[in-house]
From Swiss-Prot:
The lineage of its organism: Eukaryota, Metazoa, Chordata, Craniata, Vertebrata. This is Endothelial cell-specific chemotaxis regulator. The chain crosses the membrane at residues 131-151. InterPro entries: ECSCR. May be heavily O-glycosylated. It is a single-pass type I membrane protein. It comes from Mus musculus (Mouse). Residues 19-130 are extracellular.
Length: 214
């Protein structure tokens, strides 16, 4: 019995000690939630210096949407999402301003083009005629040179043929060869005649000896 009463007393003491801690934690949670609601209700206003220096373009304003504020882990303060969105939109505005040319640059470009056109000479009818005449004269000169070269080549060939024809009958070896050929032919004829005579003589002698024997 004494043990049971002692255990009950300890349990009661532990219950009384745990009650103030739970009340303290609940009060802290309520304070934090009230702070979060106050922060979320406050409107977010961008800095005036950034808005003055950087202008937003129409498509950026149309695409701009309010973002919800999120709480950081265990800090109770909103993250800087609005500042990042404003910086990205300002960058887009700068890019659009850079892409559109200013009137000063366009006027400078037009002035440069006019100066270049005034410096460059415009082609006139006289210059065109001189160029055409020069081209025709050069073409005629080239044709004359080609004709002269062809005539000289043909004349040289004709002269070479004439020289060859004139040199062929006047060769010293050709006359000697013709004479030797004629003498050789005559000797052959004489040899054949002599041999025929000898044969006839021999035949006549043989016939005479045969008659004597008979």
């Amino acid at each position: 019995m004494r043990l049971g009463s002692a255990i009950l007393g300890l349990l009661l003491l532990q219950g009384y000690s745990s009650q103030p801690t739970t009340t303290q934690t609940s009060q802290e949670i309520l304070q934090k939630s009230s702070q979060v609601s106050l922060v979320s209700n406050q409107p977010v206003t961008p800095r005036s210096s950034t808005m003055d220096k950087q202008s937003l373009s129409l498509p950026d304003l149309m695409s701009f949407q309010p973002q919800k504020h999120t709480l950081g882990p265990g800090t109770g303060t909103p993250e800087r999402s609005s500042s990042s969105s404003s910086s990205s939109s300002s960058r887009r505005g700068e890019a659009s301003l850079d892409a559109t040319p200013s009137p000063e640059t366009t006027s400078l470009q037009t002035k440069k083009m006019t100066i270049l056109l005034t410096i460059l000479p415009t082609p006139t009818s006289e210059s065109v005629l001189t160029v055409a005449a020069f081209g025709v004269i050069s073409f005629i000169v080239i044709l004359v040179v080609v004709v002269i070269i062809l005539v000289s080549v043909v004349s040289l060939r004709f002269k070479c043929r004439k020289n060859k024809e004139s040199e062929d009958p006047q060769k010293p070896g050709s006359s000697g060869l013709s004479e030797s050929c004629s003498t050789a032919n005559g000797e052959k004829d004489s040899i054949t005649l002599i041999s025929m005579r000898n044969i006839n003589v021999n035949n006549s002698k043989g016939s005479m000896s045969a008659e004597k024997i008979l």
